[in-house]
């Protein structure tokens, strides 16, 4: 078998030292050998940047939500919904409503416990403000707030806030309705205490946000993308109701009504098997399902 020919620049007798570029052959430096991505200047202590708070999120959003394209845009919705799902898994929420509104707003409402509003004992600001403006501030790092959780584990809400042109949170708990608004992660003002809750009012949290068109490539939510995701969530969390409503004026159905889907699967994965089976004949009509809980 013949041996492959060696490139002209490399011969059998070359040693590693022979392959090194001789700087004397380039008295003006190695500019001719530099890649197109090369930069001018030194790399020393002065080039190290420290980004404070949510500035890092706005500077490199892809590190937190994957991209600034369609996938990252919808990931913001998932992060807010994941917080509500965590409330459901903790046993305090059974309904999540997701609404797509005009002007590229999205609203997520649950009937959970509501984000705490009292002053944080260490940071000395309302806890809801802390959760929405500080990375890694949340109830999922221990201390009994949650046994299990999803999403970015305390990062999600603050990341969405940082990437939103406008972000509004409303909390119903401790006997009152509370409200605070933000712009690109910065509070527009202090947490407001509004009207007292009535005997028929439910507790919970509502988040309404408008993604920044200066950060995302496009800020139009796709209904079908969200529908597919929330159907899967409902299958995985039996008994949890997720309602998706598209209230955008240009997305109404033939009768002019908002497009609407209601996902509720009381048998969870068993219902998922039925969904996959559809109208096809099945060999075994009884779906085998096993479940266990760790202490």
Task: Describe the predicted segments one by one.
Residues 2-47, 103-127, 138-266, 271-272:
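GHKL-type ATPase core
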Residues 71-94, 156-163:
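Conserved ATP-binding N-box helix of the HATPase_c
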Residues 223, 231-235, 277-280, 287-289:
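Duplex nucleic acid-engaging cores and interfaces of nucleic-acid transaction enzymes
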């Amino acid at each position: 078998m013949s041996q492959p020919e060696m490139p002209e620049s490399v011969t059998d007798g070359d040693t590693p030292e022979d392959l090194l570029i001789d700087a004397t052959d380039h008295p003006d430096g190695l500019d001719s050998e530099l890649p197109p991505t090369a930069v001018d200047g030194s790399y020393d202590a002065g080039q190290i940047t420290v980004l404070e708070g949510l500035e890092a999120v706005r500077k490199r959003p892809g590190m937190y939500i994957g991209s600034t394209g369609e996938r990252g845009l919808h990931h913001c919705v998932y992060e807010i919904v994941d917080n509500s799902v965590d409330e459901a898994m903790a046993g305090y929420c059974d309904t999540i409503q997701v609404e797509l509104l005009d002007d590229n707003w999205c609203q997520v409402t649950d009937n959970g416990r509501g984000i705490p509003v009292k002053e944080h004992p260490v940071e000395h600001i309302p806890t809801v403000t802390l959760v929405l403006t500080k990375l890694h501030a949340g109830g999922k790092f221990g201390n009994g707030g949650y046994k299990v959780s999803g999403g970015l584990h305390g990062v999600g809400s603050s990341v969405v806030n940082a990437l939103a042109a406008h972000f509004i949170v409303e909390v119903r708990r401790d006997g009152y309705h509370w409200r605070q608004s933000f712009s690109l992660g910065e509070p527009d003002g202090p947490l407001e205490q509004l009207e007292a809750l009535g005997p028929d009012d439910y507790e919970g949290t509502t988040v309404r946000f408008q993604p920044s068109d200066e950060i995302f490539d496009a800020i139009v939510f796709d209904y079908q993308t969200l529908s597919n995701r929330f159907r899967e969530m409902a299958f995985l969390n039996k008994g949890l109701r997720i309602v998706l409503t598209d209230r955008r004026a240009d997305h109404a159905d033939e009768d002019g009504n908002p497009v609407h889907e209601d996902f509720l699967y009381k048998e969870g994965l068993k219902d998922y098997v039925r969904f996959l089976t559809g109208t096809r004949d099945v060999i075994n009509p009884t779906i085998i399902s096993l479940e266990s809980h760790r202490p």
